[in-house]
Amino acid sequence: MEALRQRIEAAFEARAEITPATVEPSVRADVEKAIAMLDTGEARVAEKINGEWHVHQWLKKAVLLSFRIFDNGVIEGAETKYFDKVPMKFADYDEARFRKEAIRVVPPAAVRKGSFIGKNTVLMPSYVNLGAFVDEGTMVDTWATVGSCAQIGKNVHLSGGVGIGGVLEPLQAGPTIIEDNCFIGARSEIVEGVIVEEGSVISMGVYIGQSTRIFDRETGEVHYGRVPAGSVVVAGNLPSKCGTYSLYAAIIVKKVDAKTRGKVGINELLRIVD
């Protein structure tokens, strides 16, 4: 894999000269291999090592190179046709393969090739972009979007209309990450490389980016870019220093452990007790 990484890095430096007509066959083959590794889960854009998330930028570079290398083509759909550079992940699947991988895909869900979908996942009519990683047992509900290179953990529920932001550029930016056993409420948006740590519950209509204040009402601490593990978060506001206005914030109303979360329903967790 190290040799492949080095070749992808070198090709990326010369990307301005690369087009579908001029690309070297060896470069095309390397990019195709990297995309295939993302597609099968053999490689992923980000992974947790010793408790810290590490981003493999060369895989993002491979994804970006693919847009320069591959030309648009017709993609056949059940109800219509499409015209794009990236083929659909399930275009060549048959019943046996769907059953083997234990994936449910409800039409018209769209999943681009180069994204990984783990076993026992359910994809309602939703969208998963290339480079994304969706782990086992996760539900991607209706009209939810998993952006490019986003990392979704095991047993996550992305409710209807949820947006998980993608990140290809700027290149140095980290992907948006939802860790294992999280619940993201309907119409919430988690973007700009924010990390929602394990076992957290995000209520309906919560918007979190890198500049969003995440206020823990129990401790008074303010977080940016990270929702601590086991947090229950709702949309709210914090007053200005002068007291004349308030600005949006995400509010951590309580913390729960796995045992409590297993016994208590999501709706009950989201009840705010003053």
From Swiss-Prot:
HAMAP family: DapD
Originating species: Shewanella pealeana (strain ATCC 700345 / ANG-SQ1)
InterPro entries assigned to the protein according to its UniProt record, in alphabetical order: DapD_Trfase_Hexpep_rpt_fam, Hexapep, Hexapep_transf_CS, THP_succinylTrfase_dom1, THP_succinylTrfase_N_sf, Trimer_LpxA-like_sf
Pathway(s) this gene product operates in, as recorded in its UniProt entry: Amino-acid biosynthesis; L-lysine biosynthesis via DAP pathway; LL-2,6-diaminopimelate from (S)-tetrahydrodipicolinate (succinylase route): step 1/3
Cell compartments where the protein resides: Cytoplasm
PROSITE patterns: HEXAPEP_TRANSFERASES
The keyword Zinc belongs to this UniProt entry's keyword annotation: no
Domain of life: Bacteria
GO cellular component: cytoplasm
UniProt family annotation: Belongs to the transferase hexapeptide repeat family.
EC number(s) given by UniProt: 2.3.1.117
Gene3D superfamilies: Hexapeptide repeat proteins (2.160.10.10), Tetrahydrodipicolinate-N-succinyltransferase, N-terminal domain (1.10.166.10)
Catalytic activity: (S)-2,3,4,5-tetrahydrodipicolinate + succinyl-CoA + H2O = (S)-2-succinylamino-6-oxoheptanedioate + CoA
Protein's name according to its UniProt entry: 2,3,4,5-tetrahydropyridine-2,6-dicarboxylate N-succinyltransferase
Key word Zinc present: no
Quaternary structure note: Homotrimer.
Binding site for substrate: 104, 141
SUPFAM superfamilies: Trimeric LpxA-like enzymes
PANTHER family: 2,3,4,5-TETRAHYDROPYRIDINE-2,6-DICARBOXYLATE N-SUCCINYLTRANSFERASE, MOLYBDENUM COFACTOR GUANYLYLTRANSFERASE
Example GO biological process: lysine biosynthetic process via diaminopimelate
MF terms (GO), sorted A to Z: 2,3,4,5-tetrahydropyridine-2,6-dicarboxylate N-succinyltransferase activity; nucleotidyltransferase activity
Keywords, sorted A to Z: Acyltransferase, Amino-acid biosynthesis, Cytoplasm, Diaminopimelate biosynthesis, Lysine biosynthesis, Repeat, Transferase
